[in-house]
Design a protein with these regions (language model features):
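Gly/Ser/Thr/Pro-enriched helix-cap/hinge segments flanking short amphipathic alpha-helices
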Residues: 3, 44-47, 51-170
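Residue-level recognition of alpha-helix boundary/capping or hinge positions
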Residues: 8, 34-38, 112
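Acidic/hydrophobic-patterned starts of short beta strands in beta-sheet-rich repeat architectures
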Residues: 17-26, 84-92
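Short, conserved, GDST-rich strand-edge loop motifs in beta-rich repeat architectures
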Residues: 26-43
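Structural signature of eukaryotic scaffold interfaces centered on beta-propeller domains
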Residues: 12-17, 79-83
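Conserved beta-strand position repeated once per blade in WD40 beta-propeller domains
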Residues: 9-12, 75
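Short charge-dense sequence patches
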Residues: 1-4, 26, 30, 78
Length: 170
């Protein structure tokens, strides 16, 4: 990560449905007068790091689009806004309107799991789900209050890459 950037939210999610979680970082400095200092600005570019395997991530740096914009971001909500099978990101910003980063680049197969309890925990908050597919085991949990001024989709999304079937769900 860049020392000149001030991170306000970090989330792992599978941006490309390849079964590996990538990393989104919302940035924006906390002090509006920070521009008095060299190499530091109040609005900053958010970042996306793609999981390239073996514990390594590479930053995806676009030349245009929402990730190229400088904003004062504070939180982010993750979910499939347009219901097309990939995770979109809605970013809460301080000095501008929210930014919807619509994801249209994911190509792998996927499954979405919505849990529904019968008692007081209707949304299944805290439930842990394992998906076994294509020789991989993925684990995710239903979480509430995931980010500042933001709430991510409570449905769990698992990218399956090229796998044609799910072996088991626990």
């Amino acid at each position: 990560c860049n020392r000149d950037l001030r991170s306000t939210d970090i989330k792992f999610f599978d941006v490309d449905n390849d079964g590996d979680r990538d990393l989104f970082v919302a940035n924006g400095h906390l002090e509006s007068d920070v521009e008095e200092y060299e190499n530091t600005t109040f609005p900053q570019r958010n970042q996306l790091y793609l999981n390239v395997g073996e514990g390594r991530f590479e930053e995806y740096v676009p030349t245009d689009g929402a990730l190229a914009l400088k904003r004062v971001s504070r939180g982010a909500a993750f979910g499939d806004y347009d219901d097309d099978g990939d995770i979109d990101v809605l970013v809460a910003n301080v000095t501008s309107a929210p930014t919807l980063m619509r994801n249209d680049g994911a190509e792998g197969h996927w499954v979405r799991i919505a849990l529904e309890g019968t008692g007081s925990n209707r949304a299944g908050i805290g439930a842990r789900v394992e998906v076994h597919s294509g020789g991989k085991v993925q684990v995710n949990e239903v979480r509430s209050g995931s980010s500042f001024l933001s709430q991510s989709d409570l449905r769990l999304h698992f990218g399956l890459a090229a796998a044609q079937a799910i072996d088991r769900v626990v």
